[in-house]
UniProtKB/Swiss-Prot annotation:
Residues 2-216 form the ABC transporter domain. This is Uncharacterized ABC transporter ATP-binding protein YnjD. Belongs to the ABC transporter superfamily. ATP binds at G34, P35, S36, G37, C38, G39, K40, S41. The keyword ATP-binding applies.
Length: 217
């Protein structure tokens, strides 16, 4: 379970978010909706431990009954998928994925884990492929595989579908939701598009917390 408790974010001269509270159970996907600038991505930055220095924050982040906002980023065990795939083009597809694997996985098990993931995503045989030769949809799949191979205990989706064309977007979206639900981890996504919201899942309007919301609409 992922719990955001009484979180407020502010700049020196203004408040951005006030008293954010929500909980995501294992296997559930909660969607945060609101216009650009209302604080969605800033909240994600705080959750992963990458909040810009100009912001101050109060509140707590809990994951599986452990408070994690006081931990370094690497120890929080939260994965994130961005709009851009952010692959390392100097490495092959397989090398990109190997970088994500936990150090506890050794020897041939590392290569096998990557090949299994590629096969599951329809990219069998792409281990040695140059990421620059991949289509947008393929790059997006590799980015998700990289996030999941790190074995996160929770996952954040920061509008990962927004730059895909309509045909790719629907298929990739359904594949993402299937993958994360199979892992039974809590997921939070931000989006502007109601079509990105899974059926029978919760949607939270940023208006209830954002100080800028009404100015941006």
């Amino acid at each position: 379970m992922l719990c955001v408790k009484n979180v407020s974010l502010r700049l020196p001269e203004s408040r951005l978010l006030t008293n954010v509270n929500f909980t995501v159970d294992k296997g559930d996907i909660v969607t945060l909706m609101g216009p650009s600038g209302c604080g969605k991505s800033t909240l994600f930055s705080w959750m992963i431990g990458a909040l810009a220095e100009q912001f101050s924050c109060t509140g707590e982040l809990w994951l599986n009954e452990q408070r994690i906002d006081i931990l370094p980023t690497a120890q929080r065990q939260i994965g994130i998928l961005f709009q851009d795939a952010l692959l390392f083009d100097q490495f092959s597809v397989g090398q990109n994925l190997l970088l994500a694997l936990p150090a506890t996985l050794k020897g041939n098990a590392r290569r096998n884990a990557v090949n299994d993931a590629l096969e599951r995503s329809g990219l069998e045989g792409a281990f040695h492929q140059d990421p620059a030769t991949l289509s947008g949809g393929q790059r997006a799949r590799v980015a998700l595989l990289r996030a999941l191979l790190a074995q996160p205990k929770a996952l954040l989706l920061d509008e990962p579908f927004s730059r895909l064309d309509v045909a790719l977007r629907d298929n990739f979206r359904q594949w993402v939701f299937s993958e994360v639900r199979a892992l039974a981890i809590p997921v939070v996504q931000v989006t502007h598009d109601l079509q990105d919201v899974p059926a029978d899942s919760s949607v939270l309007d940023m208006a209830q917390w954002s100080e800028n919301y009404n100015k941006l609409r």
